[in-house]
Amino acid sequence: MKLAFGNRPTTPAQDVVLLIARLALGAVMIAHGWQKVDQGGLGGTADGFEAMGIPLAPAAAAFAIAIELGGGVLVVLGALTPIVGVLWALHMAGALWFVHRDAFFVADGGYELVLVLGALGLVLAATGAGRGSVDHLLGRQSEDVRQPEAVSA
C-alpha cells in the first residue's frame, strides 16, 4: 500500500540526507518524549500542561508522549514517516500556540525550536523517509527518481 503523501521518488543523495534528517529529528523528539516520561510521567506532564492552560491536558499529555517518543522511534526506522510528520507538525503548532507564542527565541521561552521541528515534520510528510527506510522496504514509497535514458535513432 502506497501512502497518499510522502511518496516522492528520491535520488541516492536525497536518501542520505533524509536518513540524516530522520535520525536527527527522531533523536530530538525521542529525547523530549523521554524527558516527559522521566520527569513526572503522564500525570506530571498532564499537570504541567494544565498549568500552562492546554485544553484536555491529560489527553494532550498522552498524545505528546506518544507522538514524541513513539513517533521518534518510527521516524528513526522510517516507518509511517509521512503520518508522523503531519502529527508532529500539528503537535508543534499546538506547542507554539499554547506555550511559546509570546516570544521567538528559545532562551525567552519562544517558538523558534517548535517552529523548526514542525516544519521538518512537514518536510518528512512531503518527501517520505527515503529508500533507507521501513516504509520503502514495505513498498509504501516509490522506488527511485531515475528516468530511462532516451534512445537515439
Enumerate the language-model features and the residues they cover.
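Extended, low-polarity transmembrane helix blocks
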Residues: 1-37, 58-66, 70, 77-153
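Membrane-interface interhelical connector segments
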Residues: 38-59
